[in-house]
Amino acid sequence: MIAYCGTTTMSDDIDWLHSRRGVCKVDLYSPKGQQDQDRKVICFVDVSTLNVEDKDSKGAAGSRSEGELNLETLEEKEIIVIKDTEKQDQSKTEGSVCLFKQAPSDPISVLNWLLNDLQKYALGFQHALSPSASSCKHKVGDLEGDYSKIPSENCYSVYADQVNFDYLNKGPQNLRLEMAASKNTNNNQSPSNPATKSPSNQRSVATPEGECSMDDLSFYVNRLSSLVIQMARKEIKDKLEGGSKCLHHSMYTSGDKGKTSPRSAVSKIASEMAHEAVELTSSEMRGNGEDCRDGRKTFLYSEMCNKNKCGEKQQMCPKDSKEFADSISKGLMVYANQVASDMMVSVMKTLKVHSCGKPIPACVVLKRVLLKHTKEIVSDLIDSCMKNLHNITGVLMTDSDFVSAVKRNLFNHGKQNAADIMEAMLKRLVSALLGEKKETKSQSLAYATLKAGTNDPKCKNQSLEFSAMKAEMKGKDKCKSKADPCCKSLTSAERVSEHILKESLTMWNNQKQGNQGKVTNKVCCTSKDEKREKISPSTDSLAKDLIVSALMLIQYHLTQQAKGKDPCEEECPGSSMGYMSQSAQYEKCGGGQSSKSLSMKHFETRGAPGPSTCMKENQLESQKMDMSNMVLSLIQKLLSESPFSCDELTESDNKRCCDPRSSKAAPMAKRPEEQCQDNAELDFISGMKQMNRQFIDQLVESVMKLCLIMAKYSNNGAALAELEEQAALVGSGSRCGRDAMMSQNYSETPGPEVIVNNQCSTTNLQKQLQAVLQWIAASQFNVPMLYFMGDDDGQLEKLPEVSAKAAEKGYSVGDLLQEVMKFAKERQLDEAVGNMARKQLLDWLLANL
């Protein structure tokens, strides 16, 4: 017999994360010498992985029979358990089949995804281990076959059918089966009203309030479509001889593809029905097509199901449409119009009644439909856009004329506005350097002179090299009286610096226009007899010097800002201003450290707390310095990775690390070395292409590395924060969860041994994850020994070792589930970053348990 009923899901009350149940033993099934033991056999079947041929040929009778066993419309939150209620005396093994649909992995909420699958396996174990009569709630009525009424007070009659079931590999046996359909939701369901009105309503689950427990739009559409199908089925059923005959159908495992199943009675009857319906329809249509609806004649039509469950279409297809299309088109349109109007009215009524008095707005339904369709095409859309963009940019960048034109326009624009850019940059730098004044300290800023000029009349463009500016902080008398802020005036150093900057900018503008002005700088006077370096005739040197000068000036400003905090470090030894030692160490190592290691070193220096008087100030200063340290390390990394000449880098380092006198002598010492480079003149076009391409490639590579590092560590930080948030949320309810666990009426006595056969896994990871979740569910129900059958590829051979290790270390069900959550979280993080996980689940558990 087959009985549909709603059950109260005992597994919904389980606090899986805090369950203290011990794990059971696990082993691989071996049929030798184990035939006479009392055990249960559970076969988990994922209906989404069944072959279409098996569904059409073998399962057609079951899906279209009076019992409404349609596996194609099985939802993700619904399971079907088929049990052997007539246990044979000579066999102590009782079999069950659990039909469900595997839900896809959810990268947003790993916990809900794992608990959803775990609930399905727990429901399968619950119904398989429970007594046969406990899963029915009302009484079984008389059957029209050879079976009689079962004397039980807690069963009810829905519809009975004899099933020919192929049980494992022991040959077909006539078994009396019981089917229990339950919803995997968080609300307990206690059916009180048997749905016995029509066979099409067998799968609906009623609640005491009279409302449907599902609030999904697809359920109502499927239910409405079943009513339309029932109308056509009733007309076809009238043509059968003996409409109350018992139907037979067969169920076979998906692995028996080579076997030819015997044609069942339902298949024969269905073929006869279709043949007779076609003949009757053809004869009636030859007579008069418009009288078909009034005369209660039948049309054979097929159902087109939308697999996304967003809606279903009914398309009526007459077999002889080519010959009689003109005569029956009007009748078909009238019939389709009536069916469509009835469906719309029924949909509105159903939504109004079964949605707690609040109909679902049309915009919400449209949003669901759009989201489901958008998720399927967004990946292809992104791939096509990136491919087209790559093709376009690849063709343009290989075109030398296009590249040269872009670079020419870019550098012409930069050449015209170079003076304004340099002036604004230097003014901002001077204001930043002279903005923060100490009352107890005076600033003596010594600026190195600006060297400019040329001895080569062929050079049209003149370069301007700014040497690094060094600030010397000299302490004055601390007892000096405070000056009036209103009477403050510019110091001599400020006036000299402003005068030098103005003169240098004026001189540089004159040289750019071709006016050879006289150099008034002392260093230029002393170096008249020396041969000056030759400037590259290409315009890209101006842009390169501009970028290098900007980076060096920003680097110098950050270094001097950190240097100015040294006296504060001496007063507060535990503060976090120890960056200068790190910067010096960075320069000694040649800039080999990355920004990550530099920032980690800076965090380590903050370990020792300082005195209580300056703790708050130190924390604020440390937050400001962290950002400047990261920017400084990034600039140093860009300068070290960019293809500049060694002479320019060493010259800038000497200017940065020495006093003003040594900085003046440094360019003079480099004159003989630069004379060797003056002899080699590069062509304008070739030099621009080579240098610009190499420079741009290096900059792009450095920026991409930085973006990858930032994306990787930001994702990990967000993931760790999410894990901590989930752990805190779960920990808040741990006490009430444990109290609820103590009040549950689970059987403490060990139950029978269970053999599990899985026919739903497609990948190795999914197969191992499914086996571990089934192990957790079996442990919760006190299964002493769990056997796994059908491990032909050897993916579960390490599972007994994992179970032995977990039992040895005292792991519980909740501890094991938390370890599985960690593995799933780490794997999704690796996939998001682009790293594929090498270890499988069982290998990871062996290494981390």
From Swiss-Prot:
Q: Which stretches does UniProt call biased (Polar residues)?
A: 183-205
Known tissue expression: Expressed in the fibrous sheath of spermatozoa (at protein level). Expressed in step 1 to step 6 spermatids, abundance then increases during steps 8 to 12, abundance decreases thereafter.
Q: Does the keyword Cell division apply?
A: no
Residues modified as Phosphotyrosine are Y301
Q: Which residues carry this modification: Phosphoserine?
A: 96, 130, 190, 204, 213, 226, 271, 302, 341, 431, 442, 444, 463, 492, 497, 504, 538, 583, 628, 633, 652, 702
Name the keywords, alphabetized.
Cell projection, Cilium, Cilium biogenesis/degradation, Flagellum, Phosphoprotein
| Region Disordered, residue ranges | 183-210
| Gene Ontology CC annotations of this record | cilium; motile cilium; perinuclear region of cytoplasm; sperm end piece; sperm fibrous sheath; sperm head-tail coupling apparatus; sperm midpiece; sperm principal piece
Presence of the UniProt keyword Phosphoprotein in the record: yes
- Lineage, top-rank taxon, reads Eukaryota
- The propeptide sits at 1-188
Localization of this protein: Cell projection, Cilium, Flagellum
Extract the ranges annotated as region (PKA-RI-alpha subunit binding domain): 335-344
Q: Where is this region: PKA-RI and PKA-RII subunit binding domain?
A: 219-232
What post-translational changes are documented for it? Phosphorylated by STK33 during sperm flagella assembly.
| Principal localisation | other
User: Which InterPro entries does the protein's record reference?
Assistant: AKAP_110 (IPR020799), AKAP_110_C (IPR018292), RII-bd_1 (IPR018459), SPHK1-interactor_AKAP_110 (IPR008382)
Family listed: Belongs to the AKAP110 family.
State what this protein does.
Major structural component of sperm fibrous sheath. Plays a role in sperm motility.
Give the domain note.
Answer: RI-alpha binding site, predicted to form an amphipathic helix, could participate in protein-protein interactions with a complementary surface on the R-subunit dimer.
Q: How does it assemble?
A: Interacts with PRKAR1A and PRKAR2A. Interacts with ENO4. Interacts with QRICH2.
Q: What is this protein called?
A: A-kinase anchor protein 4
Q: Which gene holds the coding sequence for this protein?
A: Akap4
